[in-house]
């Protein structure tokens, strides 16, 4: 018995240790994926603004580049272009702010603190980054060519590792720096936003302390980055170069691999975090080298011959040798420093052979000679020299595309996207080919033989070195602009719609109309906007193998074919028809060789695979796609049932809540109640919810609200695909959790609605309109006497320029919110004299007294106010009826100002509602109905 007891004890001990080990192993299980998902969500905030910025960048450049002698038109184009430029130039800052806000529960002060952090960090770093020249001497002027930088103990940091931000020379941390700053800011915010400091410095307590601590922490972060980031930057550049060579010499293998991984990450919502480094950093390629003053067009003048312009030269067809010959471009002299090129070929060659000559020795000089001088410098300042997509946009707006070089055989070479793409075949036209002065002798320009003779003669006397053809390469052999994004166009514009047609035709004939209404809209969304999730999730949950084994593979093939066949079609957001026109068709219309014609060719090829493959697999495996399985409950059907319930008189008090609030409440119940919610998040199409107890989650109500699918990526992390409604639901659910909406009352409405009896057997309406409140009652905000607006000594209110309503002469200074619970303080003027409230979408203004804006006009932020003691905050919602808004010292106010208080419904709210007075004269008590708004359509 004793032995058994010991064995039992050992077993218990072993079991206990095993449990501890298992808990330790699983302590962070899934947390990293959740973090990456949240990061991906944050990245989408700045990415969302890139389409409009890209449009301005492209359109502005098109106007400026074709303005000719019309100075006004040119400046108008630059005006538009620069607006787009500045967004891309400050992309790292935007990422920092977005990440900080995302990880801090949408706290605005976190975004402000992130900007302080970013600015301070780069300011600290700039003082320790010192440029040096070829001799290794520190440069103190702006004209000496920069050979590199000294950063702390690192004595030779390459130029591409340094960038310009906020006008400061700093490390090229790009979006990685923004993510680092945003993440650190969110950590500091969560730790210090509620800090209480001693009373003597109490002003700096709470959220005011967050930007202060961010400023201080920026010091060690700056020093750490100065120590390690140059090596990281060099590593990223090497990755970009390596991936680029894999594309150029590996037959597009990089884009094939990228395409599959990018699609495969869609269900987890982390694909944004995957592609962002390749789109926006040097990991996706770099133009830094060819615009750096140290990269000479002539190889023996510099360390590397990897970045030689392949069109700047002459080929001897007899021995396959080539000479580098500089010359004037587009009628300009061939010197960036004012030296005039010789008018004859021999003079040009002689000038070039002198190492002291500056006549188009570098790519930067070449580009400056072809464009408005400094355009590539501007690209560098705006951060458009790194990242596959940013480079494409930079070139598109640089002014270099479309410029022409006069070749010695009489032909003209036009610089296009192909000049900078490693998929461009390395081939030279037969005969001589060189850049020459436009005023060179016509005998030489049009006579390759004479050119060869002159060159050979010059070679004999000046010892000109010959280079074999294969030593001269494309502009950047490791770069292909837009290679990590353009592959989306064929499968989004053609492949997915073809799969959609297959789904519709695979449904029984009597249900094809139903299938078309669901699948057709999702496929059209993919075509028009490039948002594919609504379609992809219709079959992802039914047959994951169809997604990963067919769709993701074909997407990868799309990327691969676009790359190896030589397309360079840009985009800012996704592979939509809109982006195709703006960044494919329009550049091709300007003959910039984006080769957008490949999109329909490859797209039709993929469609021919998508359609039969999806049709056969759906039929063969009897997949329950729309129209084939149980009837899908759409959002329209759900709203119709609610309308029927209301017709039976069941919905009762539903008018107190908006439709979005009701649906958000249903979602909260489906996720186990608001107490079960740990964290909420949303991207463009997906609602992300982390819960405490996953057993409480019910997926059916979520699907009934229109979710294309619900996926659990970790035991407690759920993703529901709602399309563009995801962010709306997230905000509404957040409001309920934070107490901005009466949860108990909302639950009663939801539970009552769900008790709705079966609708009568009558013909249902053809179209069910969203539930709109027929009447909204506005309550008096204060005790007092009602007056007409005509009696207000202010023409703005008297003439009803702001809106319609009444005036109140207050009898006390206790001002309340003019409605039941849920009134939002849309705007609270800093001086305390005026407020705008939002009552179920109706905007109501309360202006206490006349000219009272003067009372606190000279007060600085943080100083105590006179007369007004504000009890609400901008953006807050009331939790009960007639909640206190502001306490007013009415006696003090009345000494200098007229206390009559205009209370009006603003004009914007009167477009769909008619104001009906309930009380117009006499005494009124706070909380009593003062007027109501009647929905105009309900009167028809």
UniProtKB/Swiss-Prot annotation:
The chain crosses the membrane at residues 43-63, 83-103, 112-132, 175-195, 209-229, 487-507, 515-535, 537-557, 564-584, 598-618. Pfam families: PTS_EIIA_1, PTS_EIIB, PTS_EIIC. It is found in: Cell membrane. The active site is at 683 (phosphocysteine intermediate), 847 (tele-phosphohistidine intermediate). Residues 794-907 form the PTS EIIA type-1 domain. Residues 1-284, 479-630 form the PTS EIIC type-1 domain. Its main location: membrane. Residues 661-743 form the PTS EIIB type-1 domain. Keywords: Cell membrane, Kinase, Membrane, Phosphotransferase system, Sugar transport, Transferase, Transmembrane, Transmembrane helix, Transport. PROSITE patterns: PTS_EIIA_TYPE_1 (PS51093), PTS_EIIA_TYPE_1_HIS (PS00371), PTS_EIIB_TYPE_1 (PS51098), PTS_EIIC_TYPE_1 (PS51103). Residues 285-478 are annotated as: Unknown. It catalyses: N(pros)-phospho-L-histidyl-[protein] + D-glucose(out) = D-glucose 6-phosphate(in) + L-histidyl-[protein]. It is a multi-pass membrane protein. SUPFAM superfamilies: Duplicated hybrid motif (SSF51261), Glucose permease domain IIB (SSF55604). InterPro entries: Dup_hybrid_motif, Glu_permease_IIB, PTrfase_EIIB_Cys, PTS_EIIA_1_perm, PTS_EIIC, PTS_EIIC_1, PTS_Glucose_EIICBA, PTS_IIB_1. GO terms for molecular function: kinase activity; protein-N(PI)-phosphohistidine-sugar phosphotransferase activity; protein-phosphocysteine-sugar phosphotransferase activity. GO terms for biological process: phosphoenolpyruvate-dependent sugar phosphotransferase system. PANTHER family: CYTOCHROME C-TYPE SYNTHESIS PROTEIN AND PTS TRANSMEMBRANE COMPONENT, PTS SYSTEM GLUCOSE-SPECIFIC EIICB COMPONENT-RELATED. The phosphoenolpyruvate-dependent sugar phosphotransferase system (sugar PTS), a major carbohydrate active transport system, catalyzes the phosphorylation of incoming sugar substrates concomitantly with their translocation across the cell membrane. This system is involved in glucose transport. The EIIC domain forms the PTS system translocation channel and contains the specific substrate-binding site. The EIIB domain is phosphorylated by phospho-EIIA on a cysteinyl or histidyl residue, depending on the transported sugar. Then, it transfers the phosphoryl group to the sugar substrate concomitantly with the sugar uptake processed by the EIIC domain. This is PTS system glucose-specific EIICBA component. It comes from Mycoplasma pneumoniae (strain ATCC 29342 / M129 / Subtype 1). The gene is ptsG.
